[in-house]
Structure formats: structure tokens, C-alpha cells
Amino acid sequence: MDNMNLGANLGGIYLDNNATTQIDPQVVEAMQPYLSVYFGNASSQHGFGVPVEKAITKAREQVADFLGAEYPDEIIFTSCATESDNTALWSALWSQKGKNEIVTTPVEHPAILQTCDFLSSHGAKINYLHVSNHGDLDLNEFESLLNERTALASVMWANNETGNIYPVEKLAEIAYNHGVMFHTDAVQAVAKIPVDLKKTRLTCCLSQVTRSTLLKV
């Protein structure tokens, strides 16, 4: 894609690709049939729906392979990263009887922080892991916040404001050893640093693939 030409047309150079990215022409081309010819409901077992279902299945397999997921069925498509984060927090909290605590950091994306505020107003306890002036966190403090009432720990993989990359693999391992599910918002990490879900103890990595250049159906 030619961001230089795009910037010239709009009077500047676009440097905000971590927020959203110009659609790759190959992606536009790949999606065209599903915006015109193949418009059927993927859940319908007729001639209009079956090709769409096959395309979604293929896309799920591609994403699973890209992220190193063990099975394609582990991939859940949502409309956006915010919906994915909400799915992780709500599902973890309400599916585990007797567990009403969440461990997270004060530097998460608003999709996490605002949801935690809402859950807190409805009885959940949110334990915030301190972050230093340099954006670093303490693994020992993280471990100290985990207990038998912890439903989920959620720490972003890479911070969208500071650029800090957090030791998600180590955090997930600590959470696993305490029987706590671990979620990471990896929107800023995928396609920039190696991600292999088979090599981590991540329970859910739901809010990741939002960059338009990643998917080619």
C-alpha cells in the first residue's frame, strides 16, 4: 500500500497504523466477491450460504495457523477488539461460580478498564497491578494478587500509548500455576512480534487480529 500517496492526498503522512491501517489492495480484491456475489448467510445450508461458510472456515484455519492455535475452532471472530475484550472478561467472570475478582493493570486499553469499572459497580473486585514510571510491572506483585477467587488476569501484550511490551508468556505461566485464566489484548503485538499460542499458557487471546493486512481469504 502507498501511504505516501495517501498522505499527500490528505495533506500529510499517515503514521497512525497501530490505530488502524489502510486496507491492503490484496485484501480488497479478496473480499470483493463476499460483498457482491457471495452474500448469503453462512449458517444457511443452501447454494448462497455454503460458499460463505467455506470461506469463513478457511479464514479461521488461516488465523489459527498464523497465531499458532492448536485447533481452528479455538478462533472466535468478533466485530472488533472491544467486543473481544468484553467477551473475555464477562465470560470468565460469570462462568466461574465463587470467583469474582479480576487482576489487570491501570494502563490497559479503555475496552478493558471501562468494562472493569462496570463489573466493579456490579459486585466484582478489580485488583490493579502497579506499573512503574517507565511502564514496567512486577511479576512478584502480579503473583501476590492471584488467589482462589480470581476469575481472570488480563494484561495487554503491548501498550498502545507507550510501546511497552509486557512478559505475557511469564505472566500466563504464573496464572496457570495458580489455576487462573489469563487473557491478553494483543492488538498491538500480532504481526509485529512473534506470537505462538502453542508455546504459551494463554487461556484466551481474543482481541488480536484487527489489522486489515493480516487476513487474505
Regions found by a protein language model. Name each.
Residues 1-217:
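Pyridoxal 5′-phosphate
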